[in-house]
Amino acid sequence: MSTKNRTRRTTTRNIRFPNQMIEQINIALEQKGSGNFSAWVIEACRRRLCSEKRVSSEANKEKSDITELLRKQVRPD
């Protein structure tokens, strides 16, 4: 990774967006009265990460519950 694109707390990443999506984001920013594209994208990424973390936690809990049930079937207490 190039050091010129990195500061202490942030890193610049170049990504491509479909034109239609950019238009929709720009409309959303105009309606909100905020033109900060980076902040909008960062917030969307945070929401996605939180959502995936929650789903992952739920899946792990479900696996744990199933494992416990199977263990009890093999070796009843």
Curated annotation (Swiss-Prot):
Protein name (record): Uncharacterized protein YnfO
Region (Disordered): 53-77
NCBIfam families per the UniProt record, alphabetical: YlcI_YnfO_N
Gene that produces this protein: ynfO
Lineage of producing organism: Bacteria, Pseudomonadati, Pseudomonadota, Gammaproteobacteria, Enterobacterales
Alphabetical list of Pfam families matching this protein: DUF3950
